[in-house]
């Protein structure tokens, strides 16, 4: 009996497995159909909504938090370097949390100022520790030796309390705080009288003249490009050839700090127009790459928004940048500034030679206050024809009279 029951159970189990197999196949097919339908529907769905921009009130609250954090840094600057204090780690964590909320350049500046305050505070504390000054223990020992009550011998207990002569200490310090601050304002006269306003004279009104229509000026000629536009064109052509360059190599001009700033302005305008993309790699280096500028219709519709970047650069940073960038790897060329007074030196040389040949020197008497009657030679230029025969040159004839 047991064998027959087992065989029947095995037979029924095999039938159940055979019945379950087509059901599993059907469920797998349905899941595949659902996935294909979902993939076909995804392109038609609208893109996920982007993060809404921060409001004015949120940005104001963020800047106020940065301001309170800077005040806290200035207040507890003495406790940042203590071993048993956790203020440094707490402030750094607070700055990092606020940095995650920064979206605009104004808040980026506040974030950079907070980090700069922390760095300056740590540097000043390190300098104060390295300097050889009076420690608090030495100051207290000097007070006890000068104004302490009781004998300070070798046999005295270290745990014994020492009292000070506060009256003598006050008299000693009194000379430095004798000056009291009073009222430094000045009161005006008490008998002020009301001044009568002078009556302004009436001006005669002139009748308007006849209307005149100005001549229209032909604006067909294209406007000349400014220096900034030329720098932008040169920089974009360099980026088009190199495709990916470091920011320092693109901006730096080793010979001129002013031209480095001009290159930085040109890069900022290219980034604003969407023609340059600035990225940061894992090591923290900045790279610039060219991009195609968006169409005007896309900008007007609001799909594309102009962005700016903040770059702090002073003379010390320029010196450091010139040391970091290897010599000869600067990409922007040096621009020569033209000076009007030094132009055409070769053309002015023969003219000056002709002028010296045609001039005559005549003694002229002048009366000087310090030396009396003085004889001074002056040049008198007369009208002479041109030697080359191209025409006559007009030269002024100067007459000098003596009093």
Curated annotation (Swiss-Prot):
Biased composition annotated in UniProt, kind: Polar residues: 354-363
Positions of region (Disordered): 1-57, 194-226, 342-403
Any one Pfam family match given in the protein's UniProt record, by short name: Nse4_C
Protein location: Nucleus
Comp. bias regions, Basic residues: 196-206, 394-403
GO cellular component assignments: euchromatin; nucleus; Smc5-Smc6 complex
Keyword list, A-Z: DNA damage, DNA recombination, DNA repair, Nucleus
Record carries keyword Nucleus: yes
Compositionally skewed regions (Low complexity) per UniProt: 342-353
Tissue and organ expression note: Expressed in seedlings, rosette leaves and floral buds.
Compositionally biased region (Basic and acidic residues): 1-45, 384-393
Gene Ontology biological-process annotations: DNA recombination; DNA repair
Protein family per UniProt: Belongs to the NSE4 family.
Role: Component of the SMC5-SMC6 complex, that promotes sister chromatid alignment after DNA damage and facilitates double-stranded DNA breaks (DSBs) repair via homologous recombination between sister chromatids.
Protein name according to UniProt: Non-structural maintenance of chromosomes element 4 homolog A
The organism of origin for this protein: Arabidopsis thaliana (Mouse-ear cress)
Taxonomic path: Eukaryota, Viridiplantae, Streptophyta, Embryophyta, Tracheophyta
């Amino acid at each position: 009996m047991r064998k027959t029951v087992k065989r029947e159970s095995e037979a029924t189990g095999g039938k159940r497995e055979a019945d379950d197999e087509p059901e599993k196949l059907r469920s797998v097919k349905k899941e595949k159909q659902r996935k294909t339908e979902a993939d076909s529907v995804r392109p038609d769905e609208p893109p996920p909504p982007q993060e809404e921009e921060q409001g004015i009130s949120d940005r104001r609250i963020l800047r106020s938090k940065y301001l309170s954090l800077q005040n806290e840094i200035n207040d507890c600057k003495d406790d940042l370097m203590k071993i048993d204090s956790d203020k440094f780690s707490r402030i750094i964590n607070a700055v990092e949390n606020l940095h995650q909320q920064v979206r605009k350049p104004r808040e980026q500046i506040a974030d950079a100022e907070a980090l700069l305050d922390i760095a300056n505070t740590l540097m000043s504390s390190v300098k104060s520790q390295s300097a050889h000054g009076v420690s608090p223990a030495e100051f207290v020992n000097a007070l006890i030796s000068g104004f302490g009550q009781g004998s300070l011998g070798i046999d005295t207990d270290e745990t014994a309390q020492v009292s000070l002569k506060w009256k003598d200490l006050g008299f000693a310090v009194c000379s430095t705080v004798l000056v009291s601050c009073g009222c430094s304002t000045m009161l005006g006269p008490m008998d002020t009288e009301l001044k009568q306003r002078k009556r302004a004279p009436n001006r005669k009104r002139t009748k308007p003249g006849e209307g005149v229509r100005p001549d229209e000026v032909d604006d067909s000629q294209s406007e000349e490009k400014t220096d900034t536009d030329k720098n932008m064109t040169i920089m974009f052509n360099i980026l088009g050839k190199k495709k990916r360059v470091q920011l320092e190599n693109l901006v730096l001009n080793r010979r001129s700090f002013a031209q480095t700033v001009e290159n930085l302005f040109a890069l900022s305008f290219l980034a604003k127009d969407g023609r340059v993309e600035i990225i940061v790699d894992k090591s923290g280096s900045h790279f610039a790459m060219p991009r195609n500028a968006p169409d005007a219709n896309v900008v007007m519709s609001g799909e594309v928004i102009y962005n700016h970047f903040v770059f702090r650069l002073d003379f010390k940073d320029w010196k450091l940048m010139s040391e970091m960038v290897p010599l000869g790897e600067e990409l922007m060329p040096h621009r020569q500034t033209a000076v009007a007074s030094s132009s055409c030196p070769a053309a002015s040389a023969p003219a000056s030679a002709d002028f010296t040949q045609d001039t005559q020197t005549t003694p002229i008497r002048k009366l000087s206050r310090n030396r009396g009657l003085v004889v001074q030679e002056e040049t008198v230029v007369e009208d002479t024809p041109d030697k080359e025969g191209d025409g006559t040159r007009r030269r002024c004839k100067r007459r000098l009279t003596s009093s």
